[in-house]
Swiss-Prot record:
Keywords annotated in UniProt: 2Fe-2S, 4Fe-4S, Biotin biosynthesis, Iron, Iron-sulfur, Metal-binding, S-adenosyl-L-methionine, Transferase
Function: Catalyzes the conversion of dethiobiotin (DTB) to biotin by the insertion of a sulfur atom into dethiobiotin via a radical-based mechanism.
Domain Radical SAM core as annotated: residue spans: 67-294
Cofactors required: [4Fe-4S] cluster; [2Fe-2S] cluster
Subunit annotation: Homodimer.
Name the UniProt record assigns to this protein: Biotin synthase
One Pfam family recorded for the sequence: BATS
Cofactor note: Binds 1 [4Fe-4S] cluster. The cluster is coordinated with 3 cysteines and an exchangeable S-adenosyl-L-methionine.
Record EC number: 2.8.1.6
Lineage summary: Bacteria, Pseudomonadati, Pseudomonadota, Betaproteobacteria, Nitrosomonadales
Entry binding sites for [2Fe-2S] cluster: C126, C157, C217, R289
A GO BP entry: biotin biosynthetic process
Family statement drawn from the similarity comment of this UniProt entry: Belongs to the radical SAM superfamily. Biotin synthase family.
Catalytically driven reaction(s): (4R,5S)-dethiobiotin + (sulfur carrier)-SH + 2 reduced [2Fe-2S]-[ferredoxin] + 2 S-adenosyl-L-methionine = (sulfur carrier)-H + biotin + 2 5'-deoxyadenosine + 2 L-methionine + 2 oxidized [2Fe-2S]-[ferredoxin]
UniProt organism field: Nitrosospira multiformis (strain ATCC 25196 / NCIMB 11849 / C 71)
């Protein structure tokens, strides 16, 4: 295994064979910074379902409250008109979707939304903007939003695209807790989904965030037509970031009419659960977030995801421009499963 100057890890070989012995599996639970290659992650995904979930649950219980789930709320502070060509995204200007462009929200709008989220039990408030990256004129408003969210006693997170030099430091000085910038998929499958920015661009922004002292929120999307090996490649890339992200959102593709990925063959729900389990095993201390796609998931599938190690969700009826389960449905599910918010 080797790593390029750009940060993409060459993770095709394994020194330990396809699957470690059972004793190695157990001893490996406490090894926070093991190196994971694609073959080892794929071997995890290939395990019998009960064995995989059992292993993930052991890891989860060692590092986390098994019945605690963080509630986060995500809003769009600038909607539509994005110049990128991400094949899953209804906010791309080149696709004909029902998303209406919206200028930047005011700080007052964000304060009202954050206060409502806190009243509903959210502890983290995330703000997303549809653009390639923030211009300097945008940063003043974003910094004010971050400070306002922090003043309410919430964790603040932003997802603003690619950052220029110095912008991460501005966000850190404002008190930003987390910056989200997903890898989306494996390096090998990436070109099938996005062509307007490359993998190295994403890694460069993550490096800027780390150097500024901000926690990293980084995950991906599954169900985009990728192979199991590509899912293993995504997890391996995330797990081999140094250090791995503090927060790992695993999104299920939400198919939106008008985007290139609309009509993609649906992913087996158990394959999604397997991906959650692999994320938990390979990144034991991270918060693994069950993210987009929950509205379409049966409660039983979500329950399996929590069993597999998910311990964070987006809470509220909307994620940027796509739907999310209603708060009352989530509360009822938590009651049925004996879960509590953290």
């Amino acid at each position: 295994m080797s790593q390029s100057a750009s940060g993409i890890v060459n993770i095709e070989t394994s020194s330990g064979g396809a699957v470690d012995s059972f004793a190695d599996k157990l001893s490996g639970i406490s090894a926070d910074f093991r190196r994971w290659d694609v073959r080892r992650v794929e071997a995890l995904l290939d395990l019998p379902f009960s064995d995989l979930i059992h292993r993930a649950q052991l890891v989860h219980r060692q590092y986390h409250d098994p019945n605690g789930v963080q509630l986060s709320t995500l809003i769009s502070v600038k909607t539509g008109g994005c110049p990128e060509d991400c094949g899953y995204c209804p906010q791309a200007a080149r696709y004909h979707t029902n998303v209406e462009n919206q200028d930047m929200l005011t700080v007052e709008d964000v304060i009202a939304a954050a206060a409502a989220a806190k009243a509903q039990g959210a502890t983290r408030f995330c703000m997303g903007a549809a653009w390639r990256g923030p211009k300097e004129r945008d940063m003043k408003s974003v910094v004010e939003m971050v400070r306002a969210v922090k003043a309410l006693g919430l964790e603040a997170c932003t997802t603003l695209g690619m950052l220029k030099p110095g912008q991460a430091e501005q966000l850190q000085e404002a008190g930003l807790d987390y910056y989200n910038h997903n890898l989306d998929t494996s390096p090998e499958f990436y070109g099938e989904i996005i062509t307007t920015r490359d993998y190295e661009d994403r890694l460069d922004t993550l490096q800027k965030v780390r150097h500024a002292g901000i926690n990293v929120c980084c995950g991906g999307i599954v169900g985009m037509g990728e192979s199991r090996r590509a899912r293993a490649g995504l997890i391996a890339q995330l797990a081999n970031l140094d250090p791995y992200p503090e927060s790992v959102p695993i999104n299920h593709l939400v198919q939106v009419e008008g985007t290139p990925l609309h009509g993609t063959e649906a992913l087996d729900p158990l394959e999604f659960v397997r991906t959650i389990a692999a994320a938990r095993i390979t990144m034991p201390k991270a918060m693994v977030r069950l993210s987009a796609g929950r509205r379409e998931m049966p409660d039983a599938v979500q329950a399996l995801c929590f069993l597999a190690g998910a311990n964070s969700i987006f809470y509220g009826d909307k994620l940027l421009t796509t739907g999310n389960p209603e708060a009352e449905r989530d509360k009822a599910l938590f009651d049925r499963l004996g879960l509590h918010s953290i």
